[in-house]
Amino acid sequence: MNYQKAVLDKKATSIKLRTLRIEARLTHEMLAELLQLNSSRVIYDWECAKKMPNVENLYNLSLIFNMKMEDLLVIR
């Protein structure tokens, strides 16, 4: 079997999420509201690579940004 473990590049993923949000002309608050989050703080945390979105939020982000879920992530 030819298997190589995928590793999530959290910093590059956080930059990608920030870029997508800005290109969509969404504020942290607007994106948090679309995702029905209690606070926009979590968006800041994602964009600083302190935390990563869970699967449900990744799915909803993919709908908001009109892309495949796996394309939101930067894998090395």
Show which residues each predicted segment covers.
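A short, Lys/Arg-rich alpha-helix, primarily the initiator
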Residues: 1-23
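Short alpha-helical elements of helix-turn-helix
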Residues: 15, 40, 55-58
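The alpha-helix within a helix-turn-helix
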Residues: 21, 32-33, 62
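Phosphate-coordinating loops and pocket residues in cytosolic domains that bind phosphorylated ligands
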Residues: 45, 74-75
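DNA major-groove recognition helix of helix-turn-helix/homeodomain DNA-binding modules
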Residues: 56-71
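Residues within the helices of the helix-turn-helix
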Residues: 18, 29, 59
